[in-house]
Amino acid sequence: MIRYKIGLALSGGSIKGFAHLGVLQYMDEIGLKPDIIAGTSAGAIMGAFYADGYSPKEIFEIFSSVGFRGMTSLLPKRGGMFSTKNFMERLKTYLHHQNIEELPIPLRIVATDLDNGCQHVFSEGALAERIMASCSVPVLFQPVVIDRVSYVDGGLFRNFPVTVIREECDKVIGVNLGPETFRRYKKTIRGVAERSWQLVFRQNTRIDKEVCDLLLETFKVTKYGMFEVSSAAEIMALGYRMAQRSGMEHFLPIQLPTE
């Protein structure tokens, strides 16, 4: 098994995933590069594009300009309310590498195997399809079929994929965008759906939070709705400030003085 010095685990979180870009921006500025990345759902999207060679600002430009309607289309009676075809095409248009194993930074993508009822971690294969599998929210989006198996959002089993890379890394930095919260929620279809996802995330992230060497999370992200693209810049800035306060500079290699 290859041993990595610094691993980075990026949680799911829908629109809150823009906070990952703020964290990555700060890491770039201080010269702290992850040797491997694990991502679920929104974390898989941001992590994949970063591993593909895009800067955080470039990733922001790609996704902040397109709203929910621009990336989906209605698809009645096909396993989901919306088709992911438009989003898949956007991924394929921008990604430089076709397969996960070709990426400059090793990547693990977490999805849920809907047929067998378990977590599945992708470390190779077609990149765009596996990203899409990781973020296909059940009922809202149709499942992604890979090798005759149906996959949906990885957040059902592992929204915060620290344990996915824990054994491979000396240190793991984790960014969790689904912190435990008891905020009041609206008794609407959307409000109930978002609250239900929060409870799922709260239950399946506890172990992962315990095994981080550095955990980044903030309750401030909980105020944003799942598809509130208009707040993308604000959310990215929030992630940047969170990273600034984290003390991650201690993970930089010690520079010995030169004579």
Identify the meaning behind each predicted range.
Residues 1-40, 48-259:
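Patatin-like phospholipase
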